[in-house]
Amino acid sequence: MAASVDNRQYSTLNGVVRSFTPNNTYLHDPKPSFPAVNLDLDASSSDDDDEKDDASILKDLIRKGNAEIESSVLDPRDQGTADNWISRNSSMVRLTGKHPFNSEPPLPRLMHHGFITPVPLHYVRNHGPVPKARWDDWTVEVTGLVKTPTRFSMDRLVRDFPSRELPVTLVCAGNRRKEQNMVRQSIGFNWGSAGVSTSVWRGVSLRHILRRCRIQTRSRGALHVCFEGDEDLPGGGGSKYSTSIRREVAMDPSRDVILAYMQNGEVLAPDHGFPVRVIIPGFIGGRMVKWLKRIVVTEEECDGHYHYKDNRVLPSHVDAELANEEGWWYKPEYIINELNINSVITTPCHDEILPINAWTTQRPYTLRGYSYSGGGRKVTRVEVTLDGGETWFVCALDQQEKPNKYGKYWCWCFWSLEVEVLDLLGTKEIAVRAWDEALNTQPENLIWNVMGMMNNCWFRVKTNVCKPHKGEIGIVFEHPTQPGNQPGGWMAKEKHLEISQQDSRPILKKSVSSPFMNTFTKMYSLSEVKKHNSPDSAWIIVHGHVYDCTRFLKDHPGGADSILINAGTDCTEEFEAIHSDKAKKMLEDYRVGELITTGYTSDSSSPNNSLHGNSEFKHLAPIKEITTMSLPPLPRRKVALIPREKIPCKLISRTSISHDVRVFRFALPSEDQQLGLPVGKHIFLCATVDGKLCMRAYTPTSGVDEVGYFELVVKVYFKGVHPKFPNGGAMSQHLDSLPIGSDLDVKGPLGHIEYTGRGNFLVHGKHRFAKKLAMLAGGTGITPIYQVAQAILKDPEDHTKMYVVYANRTEDDILLREELDTWAKKYEDRFKVWYVVETAKEGWGYSVGFVTEGVMREHLPEAGDDALALACGPPPMIQFAVNPNLEKMGYDVKNDLLVF
């Protein structure tokens, strides 16, 4: 149903009953006089009488949907957040804590209102605070590859273009994600099965606007239409929410793409994009930008952070680490646009109990649910099975929309099936699947992906016999999950049972006296493993298993030091603290045997000599007697770092450079010591956070010759700022909250690159030399570059020339800028720096955008025998900017690029 509107006044649809009132904090008071609405004749799907009928049907559907909806309120949970001015329905299930507001309605409430969802119960996906907008102040800019760039006010948008009104179902790509998270945690939060809603949207055609602005031809590069919202978000170091669609979609009249300014007969609510948002029927919600400010026609797809790092379905073997390392986010074939086929059982609801008695067994029980598909494809069939897919029952469909004039369907439909109660009593599971007109259907089993998106496997409801009342039996129904952090669901039970079974399995410790040793596995004592602590033979112990990592020394991303620092020891805790699931799987390739565990921990075969550990022998000498023995004083070390050991360092000062950047100064164990960190290498900070060891690598910004202390410049990643990382940075937040005077363990040195002075490097132990250095950094990756530059500039006899290109999201994100600019002025013949930011303020004198070949050719030295490139930054920057552009410049990337 694509009904057009011919109202001569901009008002709510006649006859629509609203029992809630929009919050006037985002509207003028009194309500403004809106311009008249023109008729979109091109959108007509039938004659005038049919159009009037369609408009009448829409009004009736909205009226029905808005029945029995309580008023929205200022929710106490929003107090103290940037959204404390927005009224919201208190029944909405919050999925990401207090803020940002991401929510879905309880599934029974969603279905109670039928085809049209009341605005207060429409699911919400916000990445940050809701912008405070005013109709009169708002403009939408259309720019890029158009012949007539234009900035439209809201009144002009409504006045100059014909408006149309149509129902559209919106679905979050994460709908049903919690089912995926029960199998394996994705990087997304727990959407249930109510991340779907349907509204009647009124707006102006995007196609008409682009025509008015005279969009360029395809041959001139006008291939993509980018949308940018107004909210300020943390993603990528600070950005707007932006994404894009192909020109063909934007200009296709059958697609019904509109810029919407009304929802269910009212101006948009703040959470849904007031005053204007994009609606792309049949697409995922993530493409429908809210609080729309800019439309940019471009040759390439949108380069925004959220366009690449959100709304992708990557192959199941790709985890977050691999996606970053290998640039999976940027592969176009994994982007999500159109919705896939899906269906859900809504009746019976979760934990519903159906009593089994003479009355209930005399009539059938009606199963109900919803289904939808994408791209305008009609749902043609929904089927239910009670026997695991052996047989299927075809359901009745209730499709309350008419297709548009091109035969497209944009809304969900409802399905129902009557079944005998005794048949339900005999089944263990009810499952549903849907089909669309392209014969797409749902897979039987869940297919995991790292973002947990587009989950559309069979929706299964489990049944169990219960006793609701004395002398009576019944059937209790369980849905797979409950949304957010709510407990419940058969998948949660099964996961808990699996963990319990694993925990209850007997754990057999290998003992020298055990008759059950595995004779097929080599056994090693701790003393034997300790001997393998050199580059010629580097063994480690993790969870009682012995690994020979010698052949991996040259391949370790962090350099051989990362392994050698733990060689010959049990490093279980440290390994767990810093390695991903992928690394843990790789470790199995290097397993050579098992550790022999005994009742004591001494290397000796006699327990009488054991002074520490788990010994139960009562005759051991107390430790205190040994520690009071007269021992010669140990010689004082000139450097603090001891390989393979942690040293305690005291936090003596913390200085705030900006709202999220700190300088931390740590005192060394002795005031006359140097840290002992070679230039180019880094250290680990070690702390117990939330009961677990946390280790993070940092490069000090203080000089290597400083005595008694070292300094770190650290960007603090706060909890609740980035929706994809709601917990923030564990170590950076720990440092920020650490009381002055507290001790922190430090371990090092680590790294495969060492600058030995005057153009000389040791890389994996091999000598390299350069007179000119091309230095590329992104974000916090500036610190190792800074460390090398600092060492060079401190030596007046070091004539190495440095050319730095430093990329950030915004100018405010640039770390150590004052120091870098000072060096560039003081040592203009030896040190040059050029900044690149994605978005810039007026008057910015450096590059805007990304690190391109042009930027690198202009500001870095040419390739040659006397040039080396140094880089440290996010993996996509290294893979897609640094590597290919250096190759184009003639650098031998394999040999002449040193990546920290």
UniProtKB/Swiss-Prot annotation:
- Tell me how the cofactor is bound: Binds 1 FAD.
Query: So what does this one do?
Result: Nitrate reductase is a key enzyme involved in the first step of nitrate assimilation in plants, fungi and bacteria.
Q: Which organism is it from?
A: Lotus japonicus
Q: What cofactor is this protein dependent on?
A: FAD; heme; Mo-molybdopterin
Signal peptide span: none
What sequence ranges are listed for the domain FAD-binding FR-type? 644-756
Q: What is its EC number?
A: 1.7.1.1
Could you say which residues bind FAD here?
A: 696-699, 713-718, 725, 730-732, 783
Q: Name one GO biological process term.
A: nitric oxide biosynthetic process
Subunit record text: Homodimer.
What chemistry does it catalyse, as a reaction equation? nitrite + NAD(+) + H2O = nitrate + NADH + H(+)
Please report the name of this protein according to its UniProt entry. Nitrate reductase [NADH]
Q: Which family does it belong to?
A: Belongs to the nitrate reductase family.
PROSITE patterns given in the database record: CYTOCHROME_B5_1, CYTOCHROME_B5_2, FAD_FR, MOLYBDOPTERIN_EUK
Name of encoding gene: NIA
User: Could you state a single Gene Ontology molecular function term?
Assistant: molybdopterin cofactor binding
Q: Where is the Cytochrome b5 heme-binding domain?
A: 521-596
